[in-house]
Amino acid sequence: MDIIDIKTYMHSIGREARAASRLIAKAETAAKNRALTQMAVAIKRDEQQLLAANARDVENAKERGLEAAMIDRLTLTPKSVASMAEGLLQIAALADPVGEISDLNYRPSGIQVGKMRVPLGVIGIIYEARPNVTADAAGLCLKAGNAAILRGGSEAIYSNQAIAACVREGLKTAGLPETAIQVIETTDRAAVGELVTMKEFVDVIVPRGGKGLIERISNEARIPVIKHLDGVCHIYIDEEADQEKAIRVADNAKTQRYGTCNTLETLLVHENIAGEVLPPLCRIYLDKGVELRGDPASQAIIPEMKEAREEDWYTEYLAPVLSVRVVSSLDQAIEHITIYGSQHTDSIITENYSNARRFLREVDSSSVMVNASTRFADGFEYGLGAEIGISTDKLHARGPVGLEGLTSQKFIVLGDGHIRQ
């Protein structure tokens, strides 16, 4: 397609999504749940077609010389297809937030004032080589009463088209407009540029992917964006930490999975406990193949540690690499997190109630924890069900974004002929 055709194509999708959003916003919970259930049925039934489409994508990715990690994210298996279907059923089982009324109170005038939860409208979701996001995003947006325009990575085009066919079937079976969930069929990057500027059709953009993608979307979008750029997560081991807890939590936070945005990237340790806790903890890291980069005080305790450079403190490694720093106080730990952190997830290990309270209050991140692994920063673990992503912004949603984060609120006023005096 040329630029004019892309614009025409995207505006057509946008108009259809806007029209569908009005119908989805008032759809009954039972209809939405039926659509989700039928999507899951179609995905299970069409497993072989989905795997065949995915095999084409994987073969093309290998021919293009894409990284092994990307190919791994791209690849579907019978287990991951079953997981997609199960995810849709789990979304169907979640409470419907749309229409929920809260904070309803009588005012002195006699009127009642409250808030009602309402859909956002049309959500544009841009993601890379993760076909499962097509099903997850479709399910979450639908349950929250929104229409969605999905733009997956070009490397997953055949997989996304196959999953989208199952999504459309579910919508049609439930009597809902098939245009409520649309997958952009072109791999032309100009479509992304058009999507993030169609403010007359799209209400919010959710990018999911690497830093380069999210920076591009943030810079080009003329529509609100729900995002996080980096996951530079910290654990601070306080001088009053239980050492056994500290070692167990810090080990899990780093080594359970290396490539997630809630993985520990920088470990801060109080100088009064560093000599006791770092040797056994770092032995665990080194035995698991984690490269350690530390400040001079850390290196003095662990000779195998490499020297940390200034850029290390800012880095989300997404790899078996960890920065380590010895600090003199809770104040210095909080200052370090303030300067180098990404406002994603940070945790303190301590038995001191006052220090825990200060850390919770003063660390300005979307998730702040006490005596818990940063790996818990996840919508499912928080009881939100599935999540569309994690936001480190302070406006509209913050932290893991589940169904409620895909809605807004409006004020409702109930009277009985009341007039203002």
From Swiss-Prot:
Compartments, record wording: Cytoplasm
GO cellular component, one term: cytoplasm
Database matches in InterPro entries: Ald_DH/histidinol_DH, Ald_DH_C, Ald_DH_N, Aldehyde_DH_dom, G-glutamylP_reductase_CS, Glu-5-SA_DH, GPR_dom
Keyword Phosphoprotein: no
Pathway this chain belongs to: Amino-acid biosynthesis; L-proline biosynthesis; L-glutamate 5-semialdehyde from L-glutamate: step 2/2
GO MF annotations, alphabetized: glutamate-5-semialdehyde dehydrogenase activity; NADP binding
E.C. numbers: 1.2.1.41
Reactions this protein catalyses: L-glutamate 5-semialdehyde + phosphate + NADP(+) = L-glutamyl 5-phosphate + NADPH + H(+)
Listed Pfam families: Aldedh
Keywords, in A-Z order: Amino-acid biosynthesis, Cytoplasm, NADP, Oxidoreductase, Proline biosynthesis
Function according to Swiss-Prot or TrEMBL: Catalyzes the NADPH-dependent reduction of L-glutamate 5-phosphate into L-glutamate 5-semialdehyde and phosphate. The product spontaneously undergoes cyclization to form 1-pyrroline-5-carboxylate.
Family assignment from sequence similarity: Belongs to the gamma-glutamyl phosphate reductase family.
HAMAP family registered for this protein in UniProt: ProA
Protein name, UniProt field: Gamma-glutamyl phosphate reductase
Biological source species: Nitrosospira multiformis (strain ATCC 25196 / NCIMB 11849 / C 71)
